[in-house]
A protein has these predicted regions:
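Single-stranded RNA-binding regions, centering on S1/OB-family and related RNA-binding modules
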Residues: 1-191
């Protein structure tokens, strides 16, 4: 029977119990379950744990640049409701040709990262803390993995990206005189 389930009674065998008396929320969909907020959060955290274990590339929108109490400058993004921090030295921001070669590297990176706010960035989770639910990631690792995948052919295969091929690019920053693009792991400025 579809609308009953078997329940084992103490010493009396099994008995059919109507679906209407099941514990929990009675849902419209016969086989649906209602998950608590804690269960949903655990499922999302488990997804991050799996991504960390498999080194899967994830994508999030760059939400801010912050200076931590320790003095570290980090980029902040969110994935599945969890705050992800990326140290500035793991952002792999291309500083060549920005016209400020003599300026402080960190300040240049922060300036460019501020122009990138709101753009989608790829990252790979480097470390997680189960207790505090803190996540540290690397954009650099994701970009290097994408380069390996798209620019270098596997064994005797031809690379997916080659001279003359038309490809899509992700616009990551716009300034009055230049646009920054990310093309499958390679960041370039177009003036």
């Amino acid at each position: 029977m579809e609308d009953t389930k078997k329940t084992v009674l103490a010493g009396n065998g099994e008995k059919d119990v109507p679906r209407a008396v099941y514990d929990g929320v009675l849902t419209i969909d016969v086989d649906a379950q209602v998950e608590s907020m804690e269960e949903q959060e655990e499922a999302r955290w488990h997804q991050l744990l799996n991504a960390h274990r498999t080194r899967k590339i994830l994508t999030g929108q760059l939400g801010g640049i912050e200076k931590l109490e320790s003095g570290w400058m980090v980029a902040v993004t969110y994935f599945n409701g969890f705050r992800i921090i990326i140290p500035m030295n793991e952002m792999m921001i291309n500083l060549q040709g920005d016209g400020r070669e003599n300026a402080d590297t960190l300040n240049r990176q922060v300036r460019i990262a501020n122009n990138m706010l709101g753009c989608d960035i790829d990252f790979i989770i480097k470390d997680l803390d189960n207790k505090s639910r803190s996540v540290v990631a690397s954009r650099k690792d994701a970009m290097l993995k994408k380069r390996q995948t798209f620019y270098l052919g596997e064994d005797t295969e031809k690379p997916m990206l080659y001279e003359g091929r038309i490809v899509e690019a992700r616009v990551i920053a716009v300034a009055p005189k230049a646009v920054r693009l990310e093309v499958f792991g390679v960041e370039v400025s177009v003036r």
